[in-house]
Amino acid sequence: MALKIIKGNIFTSQCQTLVNTINCVGVMGAGIALECRLRYPAMYSRYLTLCKEQKIDIGLLWLFKGPDKWVLNFPTKRHWKGSSEESFFHAGLHKFAQTYRERGVTSIAFPLLGADRGGIAPSRSLEIMTEYLSTLDIDVEIYEYDPLAKDDIYASTKSWLLSQDAADIAQKTSIRIDYVYKLIEAMQHSDIHQLNQLARVEGVGIKTLEKIFVQARNQSFSEQETQQKRLF
């Protein structure tokens, strides 16, 4: 089957399974992990529990089956402050190559392991990954992160936020109104294209992002239900 190298946003992949790179101490605070935390809150909650029980470790892969995608959680660090090591990639990739069939994985999209915040050169990461993934009998995509790539949930969240009154948002989400204004201002910056990038804005914390995303998602679901009722 095909192995494709793509520069873009992994969340636009049509693959059945996406790979989320994680540490072993219960922190999903940046990059793809933060996106997964926002998109799959039940997975994040379970991840915290597994870390407390010390069941997340290098070489152990945890498959979460979400409503739209499966997510393969792949430890690339022991601690979020630490660096990735090539041996961590070998351990996880070997495990994946040995178990993907029995786990029911039919296609999968990986990020370049450790190439963003892990300290591993992208070329070296790709070399190691290709060694294990190029001979598999499923479609595999390897994504080189593109900070300019479009993000579907950012677009929908931005559309909702900019269509609302700031005071109403503050009341519905229990976010201080000055933080709401910071978010509104940040979402109009030309250099922000993805939800995880908002975390770098001063005064915008992860909890704030979670509250905004949940409110936007719930509003979207409510509108969809209303529209469906009108069809009958």
For each predicted feature, which ranges?
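Macrodomain-like recognition of ADP-ribose-binding/processing modules
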Residues: M1-F232
